[in-house]
Amino acid sequence: MRLIDHTQASLLDYTCAQLGCFFPSGDGAALRHRLERHLPQALARLAHCIDKVRMWQSGQFNYLNSSQYCLYLYFLANTVWREEGSEEAVGAATRLFLLNKALNGIDLFYEIAMPEVFFIGHSVGIVLAKATYGNYLVLYQNSTVGKNHGVAPVLGEGVILYPNSAIIGRCRIGANTTVSQGTGVINRDTPGNCLVFAGTAGELTIKAAKRPLIDDFFRF
């Protein structure tokens, strides 16, 4: 994957400089060495994701594209935590998570198992719990996936959450479900291949999808 205006070394320097600015500490050299070990794997995961998104140029990563940089920080944090799990690795992953929150306004913890391919339209206000996420997920601003009394949703493949939507609690969201703007799905299931709208008296209106909207977002 081509890194626009960067090499792997300079991208690492850039990331470490941001971490040092926001979360200064005395372990800069050790942090850089740790991130350097995991950067190639994180970039490989990022490349696979970018190549599947229709609106992005395949084979290149632009660090000034805030949505792409948001994914980069998640993949790097998750890779560091997943591959090591030591106290020092947790510290590095935590700083990357907090940097992502500071720069992009997203609450995406490094322990969350995001799918291999997902797209963030606008990251501001997105809050994601430790739920089960299917591949080809689409998230827009102020969308939420959360637990209710400790129970997290299960999302199938090809789920789209438009702005200000939410999936909360004991939900099984069928594949290719689109949750419309401002709609909250709370302790409810959806059949899949459908559009979900806010109805009256807290009920949902569910309509069959005329075509797979997910095709607008991804290359299959």
Predicted feature descriptions by range:
Residues 1-104, 208-220:
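Terminal amphipathic alpha-helical/low-complexity segments used for targeting or macromolecular assembly
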Residues 60, 64, 125, 147, ...:
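Conserved short-loop catalytic and cofactor-binding motifs
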Residues 73, 77, 118-123:
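Short, flexible active-site loops
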Residues 89-90, 111, 150-152:
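Short, positively charged
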Residues 106, 112-118, 124-126, 131-132, ...:
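A structural motif detector for beta-strand N-caps
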Residues 148, 155-220:
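Glycine-rich hexapeptide-repeat left-handed beta-helix
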